[in-house]
A protein has these predicted regions:
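Structural motif marking the loop-to-transmembrane transition
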Residues: 1-2, 99
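Active-site scaffold of zinc-dependent metalloenzymes
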Residues: 68-103, 110
Length: 172
């Protein structure tokens, strides 16, 4: 029985190493931007998520072999569960207007670190948007807001059945 455990550990360790070896780490400047966004999460009361991002995640700037195989053409970031490898794409640095929007992306990825699926992550982030200070009034015209609203609507349509038109955000 112990040998089975040893084989499983060896396979998982090899898989993790292969994800790291086939991708590049973030630069020091990119890491600084990531840490600033994680501080926003801490400040908004997402200490569990921020702690996981600080202590568990291995941030990468290029796709590993698995992400190249699967593809993430519209993503700002991608998480490899259960390994904690988070690929941060150039769009993460290009399109979010500030650290609050980058924190929103990292909050989403933190749910994947815990094994949650895309539908759950989108749902939880949309519920938490006010807590982050990510509001329609301030961010409603940003690319990230529009993308996230579109993706959340596609995965969780019942969150957008309010208002006179029956298609408005029920949290607004």
């Amino acid at each position: 029985m112990l040998w089975i455990f040893g084989v499983v550990v060896a396979i998982l360790t090899t898989a993790y190493a292969s994800l790291l070896l086939t991708s590049e780490p973030v630069t020091p400047r990119e890491r600084q931007v990531l840490m600033e966004a994680i501080q926003v999460l801490d400040g908004a009361g997402f200490s569990r998520e921020a702690s996981a991002l600080r202590r568990v995640a291995s941030f990468r700037r290029t796709d590993n072999w698995w992400n190249r195989h699967v593809g993430h053409p519209t993503a700002y970031a991608a998480t490899n569960f259960p390994f904690g490898v988070i690929t941060i794409y150039p769009t993460f640095f290009k399109y979010p207007v500030d650290e609050i929007e980058r924190a929103t992306i990292l909050l989403h990825e933190s749910y994947h670190l815990f094994g949650d699926d895309e539908k759950f992550a989108l749902h939880r982030v949309w519920l938490a948007k006010d807590r982050l200070g990510w509001t329609a009034l301030r961010y409603g015209r940003t690319r990230l807001w529009k993308n996230t609203r579109e993706w959340t609507l596609a995965e969780n349509p019942r969150m957008f059945t309010c208002g006179e038109d029956g298609q408005s955000d029920c949290l607004e």
